[in-house]
């Protein structure tokens, strides 16, 4: 038999300029329908990737590992970033947007970016115009607290923006006293100041659970609950504790995670819900009235009624709920973890320092951005745990295998073990006996939602028994 050959397609007759023109029309149409139309109604959000520089040097941080890939130093020029941000603000108001602006960046609140960025936003939004965000969200490592001058400036900024109807909401990326070894070491005095500051402004915390620090997390969680109780900050006890979704998880570290979430689940059942099984079940199934002000909870069964309707998008900024824009070049990507040149969707153009239109560079990632669902991913679509899985990190998947849509095996092992463990634990506690009590029988969507939940739970339990 002769060698098999892959047919080579002759593209000599294709008008590439026409193809690019059509792709640009398509991309601009998609952006308008899937993002801009929502932004005008205050829905979804824009994620501003301002700077890729951070001095914290956290052991698990992707910016530490992949900074030059995701935000090359050569494109992060101060004057360019500031001019592009000014053009972005003009475009935001001219487009009649009112959605959340989310700053996802390195450590910038102690740099010269801070005053310039906030001054530009204040000048743009201080009028009574409706075209401004109600919330500006800033995840930050809160190291500015150690600098008295910077700390006072941030306090001033918060009050200044509150006076024009904008809540600057900060999320504290601080792991805690017993997990400081992989990050910046902080003093007890620092933590007291941090929590008083967060309490004053109703800020929450999003410490990370990594394969390296998970061994310390039971003691770390106790510390968080104790210090938040000491400061009488009950609202702050809803700490995020998101797992670092990378390939470093081993069988040993996964076992340590299971011990940790077992401890947290018991603690919440005993202390937060006073052993009320129905209320606890409503919380772990993310029933709206129980989780109104909560964030990701690593002891809940991550679930959304949207899954029943085929809207099972990955639960991070890679979903169609967020449009990321990098200020160094006004480009957009699927998310801040996938800003590799070959995956960058395209960039906004400027004429006379005004954003004019959008030019697509890679149309494929745009389709992934608006349409990729867990139920379509290889290795995920037939998984019985899919309805309870928060999903993997596309950026990490790409770095491991060059396949955006295939979860790295260690991450898959992590969530299979965790989800199976939680479902079995809650079943053994008798929580699922109360599912029917949560259902409003007159609400067709609720009936469908909880019926589907029961089916998924029973499938998982049957697989565990098998």
Regions found by a protein language model. Give the residues of each.
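Local cysteine-cluster metal-coordination motifs and their immediate loop/turn environment
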Residues: 53-65, 376-395, 414
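Hydrophobic "anchor" residues
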Residues: 329-333
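Short, small/polar residue-rich loop motifs at catalytic or cofactor-binding pockets
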Residues: 315-321
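C-terminal accessory region of radical SAM enzymes
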Residues: 258-307, 337-390
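N-terminal [4Fe-4S]-dependent radical SAM core
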Residues: 1-48, 65, 94-95
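Short Fe-S-cluster ligation motifs
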Residues: 85-105, 407-456
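Canonical Radical SAM [4Fe-4S] cluster-binding loop centered on the CxxxCxxC motif
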Residues: 38-81
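Radical SAM/AdoMet-radical enzyme domain recognition
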Residues: 82-104, 111-250
């Amino acid at each position: 038999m002769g060698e098999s050959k892959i047919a080579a397609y002759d593209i000599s007759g294709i008008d590439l300029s026409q193809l690019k023109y059509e792709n640009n029309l398509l991309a601009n149409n998609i952006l308008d329908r899937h993002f801009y139309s929502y932004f005008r109604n205050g829905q979804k959000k824009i994620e501003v990737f301002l700077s890729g520089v951070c001095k914290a040097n956290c052991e698990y941080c992707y910016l530490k590992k992949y900074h030059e890939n995701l935000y090359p130093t050569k494109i992060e020029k101060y004057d360019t970033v500031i001019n592009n941000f000014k053009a972005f603000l003009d475009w935001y108001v001219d487009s009649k947007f009112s959605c959340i602006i989310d700053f996802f960046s390195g450590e910038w609140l102690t740099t010269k970016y801070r005053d310039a960025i906030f001054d530009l936003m204040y000048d743009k939004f201080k009028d009574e115009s409706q075209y401004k965000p109600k919330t500006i969200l800033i995840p930050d490592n809160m190291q500015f607290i150690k600098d008295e001058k910077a700390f006072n400036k941030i306090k001033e900024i918060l009050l200044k923006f509150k006076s024009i109807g904008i809540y600057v909401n900060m999320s504290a990326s601080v792991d805690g006293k017993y997990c400081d070894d992989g990050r910046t070491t902080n003093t007890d005095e620092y933590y007291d100041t941090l929590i008083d500051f967060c309490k004053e402004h109703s800020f929450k915390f999003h410490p990370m659970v990594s394969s390296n620090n998970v061994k310390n997390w039971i003691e770390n969680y106790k510390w968080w609950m104790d210090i938040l109780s000491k400061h009488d900050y009950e609202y702050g006890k809803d700490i995020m504790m998101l797992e670092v979704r990378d390939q470093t998880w081993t069988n040993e570290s996964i076992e340590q995670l299971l011990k940790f979430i077992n401890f947290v689940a018991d603690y919440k059942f005993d202390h937060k819900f006073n052993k009320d099984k129905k209320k606890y079940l409503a919380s772990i199934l993310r029933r709206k009235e129980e989780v109104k002000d909560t964030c990701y909870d690593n002891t809940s069964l991550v679930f959304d009624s949207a899954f029943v309707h085929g809207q099972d998008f990955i639960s991070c900024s890679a979903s169609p709920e967020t449009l990321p824009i990098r200020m160094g070049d006004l480009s957009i990507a699927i998310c801040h973890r996938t800003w590799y040149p070959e995956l960058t969707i395209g960039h906004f153009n400027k004429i006379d320092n005004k954003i004019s239109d959008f030019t697509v560079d890679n149309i494929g990632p745009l389709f992934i951005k608006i349409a990729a669902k867990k139920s379509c991913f290889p290795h995920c679509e037939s998984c019985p745990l899919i309805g309870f899985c928060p999903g993997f990190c596309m950026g990490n998947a790409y770095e491991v295998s060059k396949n955006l849509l295939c979860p790295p095996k260690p991450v898959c092992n992590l969530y299979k073990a965790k989800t199976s463990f939680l479902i079995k634990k809650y079943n053994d506690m008798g929580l699922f006996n109360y599912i029917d009590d949560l259902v409003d029988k007159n609400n067709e969507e609720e009936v469908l939602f909880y019926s589907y939940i029961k089916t998924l739970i029973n499938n998982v339990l049957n697989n565990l028994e098998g």
